[in-house]
Amino acid sequence: MSAAGEEDKKPAGGEGGGAHINLKVKGQDGNEVFFRIKRSTQLKKLMNAYCDRQSVDMNAIAFLFDGRRLRGEQTPDELEMEDGDEIDAMLHQTGGCLPA
């Protein structure tokens, strides 16, 4: 768990800018990790932090928001994320085809 509640909340000067957003990343195992980032911060920062915390390679995880895969250069503002939104972290699977 992060120390999201310890930071002073700054007044939001409109949408975006320096405003922070609280996001939840939920793994396939049900484990939830909370992050507090600026709305203008690229999501790759959150993705790297999640992978480091879970000891997983960044290329082994697909991050999804509303069923769409996230790219590292996207920001919460671009995706119109709201405080408390959930990002799904899914392990890549290869194969899935059975021999005939």
UniProtKB/Swiss-Prot annotation:
Disulfide bonds: none annotated. Keywords: Cytoplasm, Isopeptide bond, Nucleus, Ubl conjugation pathway. Residues 19-96 form the Ubiquitin-like domain. It is found in: Nucleus; Cytoplasm. Pfam families: Rad60-SLD. It comes from the Eukaryota. Its main location: nucleus. GO terms for biological process: protein sumoylation. There is a cross-link at G96 (Glycyl lysine isopeptide (Gly-Lys) (interchain with K-? in acceptor proteins)). GO terms for cellular component: cytoplasm; nucleus. PROSITE patterns: UBIQUITIN_2 (PS50053). Coiled coil: none annotated. GO terms for molecular function: protein tag activity; ubiquitin-like protein ligase binding. InterPro entries: Rad60/SUMO-like_dom (IPR022617), Ubiquitin-like_dom (IPR000626), Ubiquitin-like_domsf (IPR029071). The keyword Cytoplasm applies. Residues 1-23 are annotated as: Disordered. Residues 1-12 have a biased composition (Basic and acidic residues). Interacts with SAE2, SCE1 and SIZ1. Covalently attached to a number of proteins. Ubiquitin-like protein which can be covalently attached to target lysines as a monomer. Does not seem to be involved in protein degradation and may function as an antagonist of ubiquitin in the degradation process. PANTHER family: SMALL UBIQUITIN-RELATED MODIFIER. Belongs to the ubiquitin family. SUMO subfamily. This is Small ubiquitin-related modifier 1.
